[in-house]
Regions:
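Conserved small-domain helix->loop->beta segment predominantly found in fold-type I
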Residues: 222-282, 301-309
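Conserved PLP-enzyme active-site core in the AAT-like
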Residues: 31-233, 238
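Short, well-ordered beta-strand elements within core beta-sheets of diverse protein domains
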Residues: 203-212, 260-268, 315-320
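Positively charged, small/polar-rich N-terminal and surface patches that mediate targeting and assembly
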Residues: 14, 236, 291-293, 297-300
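A glycine-/small-polar-enriched, mobile loop at the entrance of the PLP active site in fold-type I
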Residues: 1-25, 30
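PLP-dependent enzyme catalytic core of the Aspartate aminotransferase-like
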Residues: 80, 91-95, 213, 279, ...
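A common structural junction motif
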Residues: 191, 280-291, 334-339
Length: 339
């Protein structure tokens, strides 16, 4: 029985390895692994831990993963949800000898809070912990967390890397191998949560246009954010590229070439008005995902349910490749119905 090469598709295949190589190149990584979803990639990190540990995680993050983190006590892990943009709060939550993993999402979904990766890396490594960064929103085009001190970077490759809303995938990349990385790779094989060869091929197809898509989406998002500030029906615009955004200075340092294609707005008339806006647009698609070529709008609290910490008047906007003026006029018309 051969012990090298491509033996069984559940472990890997050539298409998967080629796409992993491209991800590693984009991230400046030593190695990368592809999974069947972003959740599969993220949860594999925790399942590969060799002992119960204390975890510090971003308070604001993708709700699906936050829900899973609240369940991992059965594995012996303890999670402290911290506002990771507040470095004092991060330091205060750190338990020397107990904290083994930091998990930060930046910019964080859906408030787009920005965490200083380099500063948190210093805190994490000061207590011999591993820093993992969910950089799905920034993409490797705008931020390379490994170059800022992160040990592992995670992406929901369903989003920007694929970019066409026809693949579900996730990725991990590491600055250096080691025992944890080896266990993650074994965990993927044991659980059978690797991506299929065909989906890896589709993902590679999407990644060929990643740079041009992300830069266009970032440019359009910045234009929309600036125009929505002061819009009569909008009480707040959340976007790291705006000077008044709390994380703008950090974003200037760590996001190179743009601030991403995601923004959120809060509607003055409240929850029902926000839902009405989402239902009244024509060009924006009402759907839950982001990073694709079509612009999407969603009432995030409705998606997350009653336990959601997301404000009920918030609409999350994923900017696609449509014309910025067309997108603004469509949104402005829907907002005008609530005034």
């Amino acid at each position: 029985m051969p012990t090298t090469g491509h033996v069984y598709g559940r472990s890997d295949n050539l298409s998967v390895q080629q796409t992993e190589g491209l991800i590693a190149l984009l991230e400046g990584a030593e190695a990368a692994l592809l999974f069947g979803s972003g959740m599969a990639a993220a949860t594999s990190v925790f399942l590969a831990l060799d002992r119960p540990t204390h975890v510090i995680a971003s308070k604001v993050m993708y709700w699906g993963f936050r829900s899973w983190l609240r369940e991992i006590g059965r594995y012996g892990h303890r999670v402290s949800f911290v506002e990771t943009s507040d470095l004092k709060a991060v330091r205060d939550a750190t338990l020397p000898g107990e904290t083994g993993l930091f998990w930060i999402e930046t910019p964080s979904n859906p408030l787009w809070t920005v965490t200083d990766i380099s500063a948190v890396a210093e805190i994490a490594h000061g207590c011999s912990a591993v820093l993992c960064v969910d950089s799905t929103v920034a993409t490797p085009i705008l931020t390379r967390p490994l170059s800022l001190g992160a040990d592992i970077v995670m992406h929901s490759a369903t989003k920007y890397p694929n970019g066409h809303c026809d693949v579900v995938a996730g990725s991990l990349a590491t600055a250096r191998g080691g025992q944890l990385w080896d266990r993650i790779q074994k965990t993927r094989g044991h659980l059978g949560n690797a991506i299929s060869g065909f989906d890896a091929w589709l993902l590679m197809r999407g990644m060929r246009t990643l740079d041009v898509r992300v830069r266009k989406q970032s440019q359009t998002a910045a234009t929309l954010a600036a125009r929505l500030v002061g819009q009569p029906a909008v009480s707040m615009v959340l976007y790291p590229g705006l000077e008044h955004h709390a994380g703008h200075e950090v974003a200037l340092r760590q996001m190179i070439g743009g601030f991403g294609g995601m923004l959120s707005i809060r509607v003055k008339r409240g929850d029902e008005a926000a839902i009405a806006v989402a239902a009244s647009v024509a060009i924006w698609k009402r759907a839950t995902s982001f990073g694709g070529i079509e612009s999407l709008i969603e009432h995030r609290a409705s998606i997350e349910g009653e336990s959601s910490p997301c404000p009920g008047d918030l609409l999350r906007l994923s900017v696609g490749l449509e014309d910025a003026d067309d997108l603004y006029v469509d949104l402005e018309r829907a907002l005008a119905l609530t005034v």
